[in-house]
């Protein structure tokens, strides 16, 4: 039946039918917008990053070049994401508000990440050695259509990755890190077609890796890129030195903008700051431990679902052609990231996020090579599990408002006991329309031909996006009350004003600088000076002080105490 069996993939013209671009764009927007434009900050890492962004916005060039919180140097929050957040606050803070403007950095990195993943996959899939077998009967997919559908699959699987559901919406350095690894993989794919431009893009990603993560990731990616350019057979016919010069020049230029800016703004402080930065980099690395490896293996499986299984399926399908460029290069990127992850002290979700872009490229090919039973498994999982989750969200929302059934009501009530359920007609309408759209997708799934290659990833991405919209739309204020510090700050401010008298400030000696900055932003007059009132974060109450109130989020074991001397 086939003319050639040199590839494990088969793709007909019908199976590579074009996914409507409007539908894809709507899905990308629908996935990321919930939790970006209408929420408070949910985690301590977001609050820490936001406090540093506020220091930049309200400070001078020194605060931009050498990130700090009230003069205390900040090394954990990497500058790339902070610069973008502060820049958006400067540009749009007057229009959107400081919090929303800062979160535009998430939208910025998300846009580039999705673009890098799609175009990186496109460049790998367009190569002759990546093409599927030619059909003896029937029309085979054209290289352009095949590259497009593999790119769509990779991008849809990225959107449908369960582990990215929350981290991809948080104002944290990991959102810049995942963009950098996507750009790095894209640069390698682009270099196959445009050697100099691709090498420049790869080098820029290496320099940005230091700004988005740490020095060691940048060095490992640099060594990996040099090795790939020297040894990968696809690059051998091309002149080596121009590519290496472009690679190293771009990496050096992007990184050294930072220290040069530090010297330009404050040569007096730069030595001490960079010494602290270097000590922080040394503290980041450690020898691999069985505990860390076990943690990554245990959490990695669910974090990368459904990308992981299809990536492994791709490697199995190409086990006899593992040296092909479209498989070998993303796999080598994963290997470089694995070396970095092994030596990082206390790995976390951010480490796992870095693996997603090259893994999605392999998973995109894996979808094309998968048997129909495996593709149907993704269909079944998306259709059944996501439909049940959407149904459960509506049932819990109704129970929260009517108080029945009692068990469901109390499950929601205990998340924010002080919050009174309110009905927001606009958001309920949006969620209802989203539910109808999901039902329409399910009907399309039941009635549509099974031969379209992007059907399974489309269902996964659409299901995750629908859940995001419905969860935030129905329970946005509940999530804010449970996870945000703003309601806590509002209660402290209300009690302070009720008991203020002639007092003008609240002593904050026992709070860290990040807490002081974001609580000040929400109106609390915190000072590190003698004040009649004092805000502490401890279970011990000072003698001779009157307790005005206790304040904490429902999820916190310990909160704040406002004292009056």
State each model region's role.
Residues 1-33, 242-251:
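Start-transfer (signal-anchor) and selected internal transmembrane alpha helices
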Residues 48-59, 204-329, 333-349, 361, ...:
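Transmembrane-lumen/periplasm boundary regions of multi-pass, lipid-linked membrane glycan transferases
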Residues 49-73, 80, 87-90:
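Extracytosolic helix-loop segments that constitute the early lumenal/periplasmic catalytic or substrate-binding loops
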Residues 70, 429-446, 451-564:
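Short periplasmic/luminal acceptor-recognition loop of GT-C membrane glycosyltransferases, typified by
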Residues 79, 83, 92-120, 147-148, ...:
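Loop-to-helix entry region of an early transmembrane alpha helix in multi-pass inner-membrane enzymes
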Residues 104-143, 160, 183:
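Transmembrane-helix motifs of polytopic, lipid-linked glycan transferases
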Residues 145, 149, 184-201, 206-209, ...:
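Membrane-interface transmembrane helices that cradle and orient dolichyl/undecaprenyl
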Residues 163-177, 217:
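Short acidic/glycine- and proline-prone juxtamembrane loop motifs at membrane-interface regions
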């Amino acid at each position: 039946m086939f003319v050639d069996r040199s590839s494990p993939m088969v793709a007909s013209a019908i199976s590579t039918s074009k996914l409507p671009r409007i539908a894809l764009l709507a899905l990308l927007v629908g996935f990321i917008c919930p939790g970006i434009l209408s929420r408070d900050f949910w985690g301590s890492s977001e609050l820490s990053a936001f406090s540093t962004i506020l220091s930049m916005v309200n400070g001078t060039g020194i605060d931009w070049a050498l990130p700090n919180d009230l003069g205390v140097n900040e090394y954990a929050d990497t500058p790339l994401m902070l610069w973008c957040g502060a820049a958006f606050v400067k540009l749009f803070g007057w229009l959107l508000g400081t919090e929303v403007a800062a979160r535009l950095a998430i939208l910025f990195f998300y846009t580039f990440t999705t673009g890098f993943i799609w175009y990186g996959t496109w460049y790998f899939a367009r190569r002759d050695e990546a093409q599927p077998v030619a059909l003896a009967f029937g029309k085979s997919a054209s290289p352009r259509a095949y590259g497009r559908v593999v790119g769509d699959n990779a991008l849809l699987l990225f959107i449908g990755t369960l582990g990215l559901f929350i981290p991809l919406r948080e104002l944290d350095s990991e959102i810049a890190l995942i963009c950098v690894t996507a750009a790095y993989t894209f640069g390698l794919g682009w270099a196959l077609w445009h050697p100099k431009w691709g090498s420049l893009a790869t080098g820029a990603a290496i320099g940005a890796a230091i700004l988005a993560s740490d020095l060691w990731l940048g060095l490992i990616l640099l060594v990996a890129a040099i090795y790939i350019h020297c040894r990968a057979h696809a690059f051998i016919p091309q002149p080596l030195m121009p590519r290496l010069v472009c690679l190293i020049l771009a990496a050096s230029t992007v990184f050294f903008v930072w220290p040069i800016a530090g010297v330009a703004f404050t040569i007096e402080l730069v030595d001490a700051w960079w010494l602290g930065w270097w000590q922080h980099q040394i503290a980041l690395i450690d020898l691999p431990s069985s505990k860390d490896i076990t943690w990554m293996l245990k959490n990695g499986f669910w974090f990368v679902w459904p990308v992981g299984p299809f990536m492994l399926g791709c490697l199995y399908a190409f086990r006899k052609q593992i040296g092909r460029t479209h498989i070998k290069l993303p796999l080598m990127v994963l290997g470089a990231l694995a070396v970095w992850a092994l030596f990082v002290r206390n790995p976390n979700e951010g480490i796992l996020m870095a693996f997603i872009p090259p893994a999605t490229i392999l998973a995109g090919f894996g979808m094309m090579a998968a048997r129909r039973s495996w593709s149907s498994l993704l269909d079944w999982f998306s259709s059944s599990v996501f439909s049940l989750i959407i149904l459960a969200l509506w049932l819990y929302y109704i129970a929260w408002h009517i108080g029945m059934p009692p068990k469901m009501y109390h499950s929601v009530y205990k998340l924010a006991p002080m919050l009174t359920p309110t009905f927001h007609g606009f958001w309920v309408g949006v969620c209802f329309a989203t539910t109808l759209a999901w039902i329409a997708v399910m009907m399309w799934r039941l009635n549509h031909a099974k031969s379209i290659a992007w059907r399974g990833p489309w269902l996964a991405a659409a299901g995750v996006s629908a859940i995001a919209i419905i969860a935030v739309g129905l329970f946005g204020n509940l999530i804010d009350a449970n996870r945000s510090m703003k309601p806590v700050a509002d209660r402290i401010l209300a009690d302070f004003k009720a008991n203020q008298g002639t007092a003008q400030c609240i002593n904050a000696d026992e709070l860290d600088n990040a807490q002081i900055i974001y609580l000040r932003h929400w109106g609390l007059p915190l000072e590190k000076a003698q004040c009649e009132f004092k805000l502490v974060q401890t279970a011990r109450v000072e003698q001779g002080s009157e307790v005005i109130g206790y304040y904490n989020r429902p999820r916190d074991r310990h909160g704040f105490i406002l004292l009056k001397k």
